[in-house]
């Protein structure tokens, strides 16, 4: 049985930061993810920052985290929200190339010292005398001194589309069932919170002549507070459709 100081279950944004923080503090760390396509995956709106969140990305960066650095690498558009108001409410938001974001963060994880990234599903947390002793995956067992559970919405996940319900992780990915039961058997209450994701459309199906273009100047501000860190990106435009409830009901966008 391989031994680790810390095992992190789940390689979403939280799991990635936890694993990197542990490894960078000198702890032998294992990061578990069901599949490579789940690492740093943006299942909802592919953006980083924004109102109420942009400052958190900066705080993660100040603590040595990776999200801000990676967001700068994969950004296709940046905008400072609330720029007409006072500096206290300025909020940097970056729209991301979700595929590039994944590629860049995987590169970072794979070269990080003290960190192993394995594509295995964690099925059980080993607990003895109320202390975590290890984890069991669909392929192996690992001994550890501590475990971080960062599974997001994968625990017994469901997808709801109108009247249609399907047992699944986000975007049709595999959900975690055995780990849910393991956590419950150890007295941990599992609750679900519903999130909403807008429908996606093909960009080639849009009649842009009916939309308004907002010219967005390339931001000189990055999430990473390092002067000169800018990377070349192809800036995308923002398009607006004005309507309301009637336009939504009649499909006249």
Please state what every model-predicted region is.
Residues 20-126, 146, 150-170, 174-180, ...:
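Conserved N-terminal/central alpha/beta ligand/cofactor-binding core
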Residues 8, 18-19, 132:
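Conserved phosphate-binding elements of NTP-dependent enzyme cores
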Residues 2-4, 138-146:
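Core beta-strand elements of the Rossmann-like FAD/NAD(P) dinucleotide-binding domain
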Residues 126-141:
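Conserved beta-strand-loop-beta-strand element in the redox core of flavoprotein oxidoreductases
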Residues 116, 141, 231:
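Short aromatic/basic micro-patch
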Residues 224-253:
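Functional-site microenvironments in short loops/helix caps that host divalent-cation chemistry
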């Amino acid at each position: 049985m391989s031994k680790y100081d810390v095992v992190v279950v789940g390689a979403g944004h939280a799991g990635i930061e936890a694993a990197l923080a542990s490894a960078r503090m000198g702890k032998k760390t294992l990061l578990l993810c069901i599949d490579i396509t789940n690492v740093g995956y943006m299942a909802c709106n592919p953006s980083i920052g924004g109102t109420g969140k942009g400052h958190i990305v900066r705080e993660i960066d100040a603590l040595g985290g990776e999200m801000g650095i990676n967001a700068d690498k994969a950004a296709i558009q940046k905008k400072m929200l609330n720029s007409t108001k006072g500096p206290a409410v300025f909020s940097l938001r970056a729209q991301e190339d979700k595929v590039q974001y994944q590629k860049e963060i995987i590169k970072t994880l794979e070269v990080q010292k003290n960190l192993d990234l394995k594509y295995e599903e964690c099925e059980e947390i080993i607990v003895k005398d109320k202390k975590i002793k290890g984890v069991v995956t669909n392929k192996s067992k690992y001994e550890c001194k501590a475990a971080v559970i960062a599974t997001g919405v994968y625990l017994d996940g469901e997808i709801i589309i109108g009247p249609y319900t399907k047992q699944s992780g986000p975007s049709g990915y595999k959900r975690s069932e055995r780990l849910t039961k393991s956590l419950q058997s150890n007295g941990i209450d599992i609750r679900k919170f519903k999130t909403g994701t807008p429908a996606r459309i093909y960009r080639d199906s849009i009649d842009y002549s009916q939309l308004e273009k907002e010219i967005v100047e390339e931001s000189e501000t990055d999430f990473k507070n390092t002067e000169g860190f800018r990377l070349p990106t192809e800036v995308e435009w923002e398009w607006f459709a004005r309507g309301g409830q009637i336009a939504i009901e009649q499909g006249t966008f």
